[in-house]
Swiss-Prot record:
GO cellular component: cytosol
Domain of life of the native organism: Bacteria
HAMAP family with a match to the protein in the record: MurB
Annotated organism of origin: Clostridium tetani (strain Massachusetts / E88)
Xref: InterPro entries: FAD-bd_PCMH, FAD-bd_PCMH-like_sf, FAD-bd_PCMH_sub1, FAD-bd_PCMH_sub2, MurB, MurB_C, MurB_C_sf, Oxid_FAD_bind_N
Protein name in UniProt: UDP-N-acetylenolpyruvoylglucosamine reductase
Family from the record: Belongs to the MurB family.
The EC number(s) this enzyme carries: 1.3.1.98
Gene Ontology biological process: cell division; cell wall organization; peptidoglycan biosynthetic process; regulation of cell shape
Names of the cofactor(s): FAD
tRNA-binding among keywords: no
A GO MF term: FAD binding
First-tier enzyme category under EC: oxidoreductase
Amino acid sequence: MNHYKDFISNLIENLGSENVKTNELMKNHTSFKVGGPVDILVTPESYEQVQYVIKHSRGNNIPYFIMGNGSNLLVRDGGIRGLVIKFCKLNRIKIEDDKIIAQSGVLLSKVSNMAAKNNLEGLEFASGIPGSIGGALTMNAGAYNGEISQVIDSALVLDKSGEILNLSKEELELGYRTSSILKNGYVVLEAILKLSLGDSKNIYDRIKELTEKRKTKQPLEYPSAGSTFKRPQGYFAAKLIEESGLKGINVGDAEVSQKHSGFIINKGNASAKDILNVINIVQDTVKSKFDVELHTEVLIIGEDKLN
């Protein structure tokens, strides 16, 4: 950590000590509740601070990773070398007519609730998605036949040179769990969503219906990262996993959920290694039984722990 000394001092000077942490356990920042320490964790409060941190990191050849709410993230037990930039303090949100302008760190569920309060429809599907708007836009998150591409108008992003770009819906190139943001290594700063005026009762009824569905069908009582695998073309991942006889299989406290086999859950004290072992078992078994490759929807980062 000594070689980071001047780098950390500069970060503290520009962001304040309350926004710079060292040796921070990532298990405290992910919905899976696993993950070793990151060397440095920063929580910028403005776009200028984001630009500064990225420029400063690049200038010092220090690798960095940008995260939102950590709800689609599996951090290995050895943690992360370099820097994690967490956008939780970029959380301002406002409404202009039928548009919602939300900074990257705002939770998607909060945006959905704000839309409902203002009789704006189109975001009911997102009421139970735990991620941030930045992460949701990057991955074109969706659920129950709805996805971000249906409501996005435009977005402010930071490109690799540190310039702020305003991208139209077309320029965002949103597809199934992908976008131009992901392909080009852009960073979402702000999303502008375009909704339509609806009936308050219908909006809340739909949110209630989807909430009940989630509670009934998903293992919300345990830490997880939501759907572990992307949907393979022509199949449903959960159905393949169940038909492979893998429901309930476990390594330590990591388990394929009995409630929904598309979820791998942490039943208590699972390590990232346990979860990765379950992922590998599922992938290998489904491949040998159905000749279908399952790719993870959850993002896996960091280093393995040295024994």
